[in-house]
Every structure is written in C-alpha cells, then in structure tokens.
C-alpha cells in the first residue's frame, strides 16, 4: 500500500505538470521578478522599521523611566526641602519683626533722650538766668543797705550793718530751690499717673535726690555764714519751724510720712525699713544728747564769766564759749548728713516706683506745711 500511495502521488504530480496546470504561473514568472525585488525591499524595509522601532521603543522606555525616576527624586527632594525652607522663612520673618521692633524702640528711646536733653539744657538756661537775676538783686540789696527775709513767711527790712551777705544769698537760693522742688514733684506725679517705664522714672528719682543734696550743700554754706540763723529756722515757714530739729526735719519723721505711700512691702523690705528707722532714731538721740551737752557747756562757760566779771582776765571763758559755738556748726552738718543718708538708704530699699511715690509724698507733705502756714498767717483776727 505504501508503494501504491507513493506511486500514485508521484503519478499525480507528474500528471499535473504534464497537463500544464502550472503554466500560468510560469507565464507570470517574468512579471514576478521585478515586483519580487520591490516586495522584498518593502518587506525588508518594514522589517528594518519594525526592528528599529522596536529598538527605539526598547531604548526609549528605560530613558523615560530614568527621567521619571529623576523627576520623582527631584520632587521628593524638593518636598523634603520645602518644609525646612518654609520654617527658615518663618524664623527669618520673626527675626526681622524682632529687629524692626527693637529698632523702633531704639528710635523712640533716642527721641525721648533728645527731648530730655533739650529740656535739661532749657532748664539749665533758665536756672542760669534766674541765678543771674538773684545776683543782681543781691547787689542791689547790698547797695540799698536792705536785708531781704524769707518771702514765704514774713518779710522785714533791717539795717545794713546787720545784713549777712551769705545768709541773703542762701535765702534767695532757697526760694529758687523751692520752685525747682515744686516742679520736680509735679514731674514725678505726672510720671506716676502716665505709668512710664522704670528707667525714666529712676532718672526722676535720682534727680529729686540730687536736688535734696543741693539743699544740704546750701545749708552747709549758710551754717558757715551764721549757724544761729540756720538753727532758728527763720528761712522756713512758721509751721515748718514747729517740727524743726537741728535745722531741718527729723529722719524718723520722714520715714513715718513715707511708709503709708510705699506699701505693700515685702518681708525683707519691712525688716530693712525697721532697721533703718531704729538706727535713725538712735542717731537722732545721740545728736540730741550731744546738743544738750553743748548747751550745758555753753551755759557753764558763760556762768564762769559772770563770776569773774570784775576780773581783768576773762579771755579763757570767752574762748571756751566760742569753741562751743563752733561745734554747733558741726552738729548741723551731722544732722543734715543723717537726713541725706536716710533718704538714700530708703530709696535703695524700695523699688523705683515705690521710691517715686515716697518722694512724692514727702514733697506734698512739706508743701502742705507751707500752705498751712500761709493759711494761718492769713486767718481773720478779732479786733480787741
């Protein structure tokens, strides 16, 4: 069977060729040859294009992936860097705001400092003019032979022979000092009402303390000129003289006046104030006892002079009395030193605002004493 099938297939193939079944194809073979090359070229070009496109696609995909990876990495890094940069911007804004506020504060402080300097220069100029006027008045008083007494209490004219130029100068300086004191107290009152800062308030407190120091310096010069005038208190009003102690106020009295206006105090402040008050009272007692002994010694020296009045030689008792009178000047200076030390120690114990309130209370206290004296002098009197 196999041989038959193979023979039959062979027979069929031969018979088909013999029958001319492939002749048309053989006729087209002449046309097939030119198109075949074109077809082959087209096919090869298509294959080349497909292979190249495939290659491009294969090459392009990794490049795109790399670009995407780079883009994602850059975006991620930018996102990571965005938060610190925003925080840095906020920090820089806060720093810039602080610097702007600080510069504004510095400009405001400089402006206030210029205003204070301008006011201080103006005050110095006014003081210079007032001092010049006082000097001219003093010269005229000397030429006219008149002695000018304190205008705030009583005024009287005395003979030229009894006039002490040092005391006349002190009276005029003290009148000017009172005007300045009223102005400084008014400034402290205004500052406390305006609630200004502690730095500016401390400047006012120090200025007021220095003003009291000037008063003590003036009194020391007046004591050299006439210590009895200073001790008598003729340069003060009658109400002030009622409370006078060795040419001025008692330091313990100062503390009693100031204390209600500086409260509340801390425990440490209370302890220090009590110690200051105790030491001031002890110093007052020591000075008072020393003054009593001085008066007693003066009385004894004068009594000795009475016994030897008929004696020709009485120079020794008089010399002893003069020494006692010279010691009186030292007592006045020591009392003023105690007053000044009490003021300074009190200001150190208190805060700046408490010290300002204390100086305001002290200034108002003396101002009301002077006003009370004026009211007393102007009271209606019954005619008898």
From Swiss-Prot:
It holds the Pfam family DOG1. Transmembrane segments: none annotated. Hexadecanoate binds at residues 219, 236, 249. PROSITE patterns: BZIP (PS50217), BZIP_BASIC (PS00036), DOG1 (PS51806). Expressed in the whole plant. Residues 76-88 have a biased composition (Polar residues). One of its GO terms (molecular function) is DNA-binding transcription factor activity. Residues 98-118 are annotated as: Basic motif. GO terms for biological process: defense response to bacterium; DNA-templated transcription; plant-type hypersensitive response; systemic acquired resistance, salicylic acid mediated signaling pathway. Residues 167-379 form the DOG1 domain. A motif (Nuclear localization signal) lies at residues 99-106. Keywords: Activator, Coiled coil, DNA-binding, Hypersensitive response, Nucleus, Plant defense, Transcription, Transcription regulation. It is found in: Nucleus. Residues 36-70, 76-95 are annotated as: Disordered. Residues 96-138 form the bZIP domain. Binds DNA as a dimer. Interacts with NPR3, NPR4 and sumoylated NPR1. Interacts with GRXC7/ROXY1. This is Transcription factor TGA3.
């Amino acid at each position: 069977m196999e041989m038959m099938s193979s023979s039959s297939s062979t027979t069929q193939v031969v018979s088909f060729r013999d029958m001319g079944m492939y002749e048309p194809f053989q006729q087209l073979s002449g046309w097939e040859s030119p198109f075949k090359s074109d077809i082959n070229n087209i096919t090869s070009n298509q294959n080349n294009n497909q292979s190249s496109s495939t290659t491009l696609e294969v090459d392009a995909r990794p490049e795109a992936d790399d670009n995407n990876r780079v883009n994602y990495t850059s975006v991620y890094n930018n996102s990571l860097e965005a938060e610190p940069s925003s925080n840095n911007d906020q920090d820089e804004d806060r720093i810039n705001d602080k610097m702007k506020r600080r510069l504004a504060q510095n400009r405001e402080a400089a402006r206030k400092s210029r205003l204070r300097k301008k006011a201080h220069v103006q005050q110095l100029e006014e003081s210079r003019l007032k001092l010049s006027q006082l000097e001219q008045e003093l010269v005229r008083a000397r030429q006219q032979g008149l002695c000018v007494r304190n205008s705030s209490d009583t005024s009287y004219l005395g003979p030229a022979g009894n006039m002490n130029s040092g005391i006349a100068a002190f009276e005029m300086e003290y009148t000017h000092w009172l005007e300045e004191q009223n102005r400084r107290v008014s400034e402290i009152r205004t500052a406390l009402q305006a609630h200004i800062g502690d730095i500016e308030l401390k400047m006012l407190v120090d200025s007021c303390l220095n003003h009291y120091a000037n008063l003590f310096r003036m009194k020391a010069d007046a004591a050299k000129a006439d210590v009895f005038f200073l001790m008598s208190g003729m340069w003060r009003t009658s109400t002030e003289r009622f409370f006078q102690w060795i040419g001025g106020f008692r330091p313990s009295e100062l503390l009693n006046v100031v204390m209600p206006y500086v409260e509340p105090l801390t425990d440490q402040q209370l302890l220090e104030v009590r110690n200051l008050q105790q030491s001031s009272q002890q110093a007052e007692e020591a000075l008072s006892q020393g003054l009593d002994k001085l008066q007693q010694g003066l009385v004894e020296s004068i009594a000795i002079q009475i016994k030897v009045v008929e004696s020709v030689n009485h120079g020794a008792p008089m010399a002893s009395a003069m020494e006692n009178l010279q010691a009186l000047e030292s007592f006045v200076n020591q009392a003023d030193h105690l007053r000044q030390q009490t003021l300074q120690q009190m200001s150190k114990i208190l805060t700046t605002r408490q010290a300002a309130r204390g100086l305001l209370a002290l200034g108002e206290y003396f101002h009301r004493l002077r006003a009370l004296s004026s009211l007393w002098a102007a009271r209606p009197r019954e005619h008898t």
